[in-house]
């Protein structure tokens, strides 16, 4: 904006109604509209609200107009959106966001594909009604070297899964999750889903990850897992176009398909057999659900109904499954390959990461008139991992092959020719780039720093994993307004 234009904007005024959904910072109900200069920006508006509230210690505020965060002057906003200054503008204010600052990084010997957290607020602990004292949280990582590792918050490895000859994975791990504080599930390129018993010494400095159950059924790589411990169920997404449905209990699971067992593979080929000195029970799937026509990238349980599942695929589709009958209920077809999936139940939306660098928010309900309810843009490479904000119903974190994680507030949107579009609130880069003195922009498409997995935990924060062979932890609390 030129100096003369800024001067004119400062002289123009607009009537605004300031509101907040947070009761402790709301203005009295009888506070009517007030006239303010259209040249004001966030800082000046924040000062104004603090003065109206009579705060001795100023609170930094952010401002939303029609659901979008104000990032310009009011005058520029009015001009960009074709709104007359004669209009009474309703402006909502919330506490200012806290940047997701880097807390720690844990280094591995190989790429890290997957991360999960065990904390007092994590699903695994909540399902088991288990308490995890502050500071005793654990981070689980799955790596391309074929090993699972459990870490404490001091970046020490508490336990490592056994080698292939001792009952471990025989190829790279792509997915790993805590089922409970003493149970872990993992899967990967060896086509198996494996359950492990996790235990720690009394002092918490050492532990064991012991093979408990091997599940066979998929014929190609397994790309992701979802767990619902209360029903003892697991979902898997595989490159064989199938969605696997499994039991965590040996007694509930059917026999493993003979033709997929390692013994059959060693008989039918001349390749070296990895003889395991550990005899682990082997079982098969409750169901393998067909329908996708390309590799399945993700499968999840409905957050409110564990008898419903969703899956995404390279075939561009999102599919809904009835897990009671293992049948396909609905198919939503998009324009791009879908690579990641997360449920936002309060908004009846599913977030799907795409190969086209954006996130599509889809309403899976049959009554939904349009497939894409919203599009989130900002990544410069494929979006391969998604997780909900545990602090806010509106928040989402994404991990991308562009080497960043982006935080989204689905209230921060605008409408353009392509419909409702959102931009990220924050972008988290890899700390490893900073240490090398390089910027993310110098890595074409995220080369060397691709993010493969992300988890957002209320106690620990934003935990991401990637091609830089690191787990990275960033602050996750207060990043978005919780209203």
Curated annotation (Swiss-Prot):
Keywords: Nucleus, Repeat, Ribosome biogenesis, rRNA processing, WD repeat. Gene3D superfamilies: YVTN repeat-like/Quinoprotein amine dehydrogenase (2.130.10.10). GO terms for biological process: chromosome organization; maturation of 5.8S rRNA from tricistronic rRNA transcript (SSU-rRNA, 5.8S rRNA, LSU-rRNA); maturation of LSU-rRNA from tricistronic rRNA transcript (SSU-rRNA, 5.8S rRNA, LSU-rRNA); protein-RNA complex remodeling. WD repeats lie at residues 117-161, 168-206, 217-256, 291-331, 333-372, 378-418, 446-483. Residues 251-288 are annotated as: Disordered. GO terms for cellular component: nucleoplasm; PeBoW complex; preribosome, large subunit precursor. Residues 14-95 are annotated as: Ubiquitin-like (UBL) domain. GO terms for molecular function: ribonucleoprotein complex binding. Component of the NOP7 complex, composed of erb1, nop7 and ytm1. The complex is held together by erb1, which interacts with nop7 via its N-terminal domain and with ytm1 via a high-affinity interaction between the seven-bladed beta-propeller domains of the 2 proteins. The NOP7 complex associates with the 66S pre-ribosome. Interacts (via UBL domain) with mdn1 (via VWFA/MIDAS domain). Belongs to the WD repeat WDR12/YTM1 family. Component of the NOP7 complex, which is required for maturation of the 25S and 5.8S ribosomal RNAs and formation of the 60S ribosome. This is Ribosome biogenesis protein ytm1. It comes from Aspergillus terreus (strain NIH 2624 / FGSC A1156).
